[in-house]
Amino acid sequence: MNRPLRIGIVVGELSGDTLGEGFIKAIRARYPDAEFVGIGGPKMNALGCQSLFDMEELAVMGLVEVLGRLPRLLKVKAELVKYFTANPPDVFVGIDAPDFNLRLELSLKQAGIKTVHYVSPSVWAWRQNRIHGIAAATHLVLAFLPFEKAFYDKFNVPCEFIGHTLADSIPLASDKLAARQLLGLDEQRRWLAVLPGSRGSEMKMLAEPFIATCQKLQARYPDLGFVVALVNAKRRAQFEQAWQQVAPELNFVLVDDTARNVITAADAVMLASGTVALECMLLKRPMVVGYRVNAFTAFLAKRLLKTPYVSLPNILAGEELVKELLQDHCTVDNLYHEVSRLLESDNQALMDKFTEMHQWIRKDADQQAAQAVLHLIQK
């Protein structure tokens, strides 16, 4: 190849920007003059990715919001198709943002451009018929988790398991003492990390039962401290309101930060379901997962979900390593019972299992992604 390698790339949110940054660096390690064009976030643009539109154009959540922005989203998609068909890249990589990227990938694949979708949508869990749309739109899917590849293999859709970037960024052993010093927590006390969710809807459902559980735990374990991770000022305000209503006499240490340091500092964790459960597993902390959604969403989920578990540690292990208390089971009594059980066990067998699972998914995902994409280009 006499000209520089040209890769089309589109991300739709900050998590995708971080993946894109790692991917660009891994490609550039082999092809220093490689060019990237499409839609990047701040980290990708700092590496010289040429953004034809602002990433914020794609960062919309929720049905109503998406409908309001639909004409603009369709225009952005049409402009990208026009650009890439006039200037064909060696490959196009859509990172996450499946509602936008899979439609774009389909158009580009039909125009004869090789397409990769990086981060599998949760097709293995619900709406499994989406697999056919993914097969039509892509030449290759890059998946974080081994059971995702197994699902694609079943349908003969090309997929590479590249490992999980979180497993790469989190060390195999985490330093509880250093995290406590960083957060200014008493090093001698026992601490429970309380993570009632990063979304407003989660906080609304979980803050009160989580706080009431802490109230009950405090009566039994007077030495137990409670540290809460809050992703932004809105979640902090929501939590503080629930705190004043339920148990104003309790002491909580509120941390405006990502969950990682809070989990690392803790002896046990009570959390909302989500990626944070995987992070907790990788940090080797015993946890209880609590989750509530509104009745209609729960009704739909019951019918659509194809997995027996909702938390990633359990899905990955294929067994209930972590207690999941969902909907009507997410009560103060049940949460209290399960957290007490963790506080009174040494949990060593569970920690050993978490370490083994960490090693399963720690493969240097950036390098694996770059290798898989370069292999596809050379085919």
UniProtKB/Swiss-Prot annotation:
E.C. number(s) listed in UniProt: 2.4.1.182
Enzyme class: transferase
Pathway connected to this protein: Bacterial outer membrane biogenesis; LPS lipid A biosynthesis
Keyword Manganese listed: no
Catalytic activity: a lipid X + a UDP-2-N,3-O-bis[(3R)-3-hydroxyacyl]-alpha-D-glucosamine = a lipid A disaccharide + UDP + H(+)
Record-linked InterPro entries: Glyco_trans_19
Keyword line: Glycosyltransferase, Lipid A biosynthesis, Lipid biosynthesis, Lipid metabolism, Transferase
Gene Ontology process terms (BP): lipid A biosynthetic process
One GO MF term: phospholipid binding
Gene Ontology cellular component annotations, sorted alphabetically: membrane
PANTHER family: LIPID-A-DISACCHARIDE SYNTHASE, LIPID-A-DISACCHARIDE SYNTHASE, MITOCHONDRIAL-RELATED
NCBIfam families, A to Z: lpxB (TIGR00215)
Family, per entry: Belongs to the LpxB family.
Described function: Condensation of UDP-2,3-diacylglucosamine and 2,3-diacylglucosamine-1-phosphate to form lipid A disaccharide, a precursor of lipid A, a phosphorylated glycolipid that anchors the lipopolysaccharide to the outer membrane of the cell.
Designated name of the protein: Lipid-A-disaccharide synthase
Organism expressing this protein natively: Vibrio cholerae serotype O1 (strain ATCC 39315 / El Tor Inaba N16961)
Name of encoding gene: lpxB
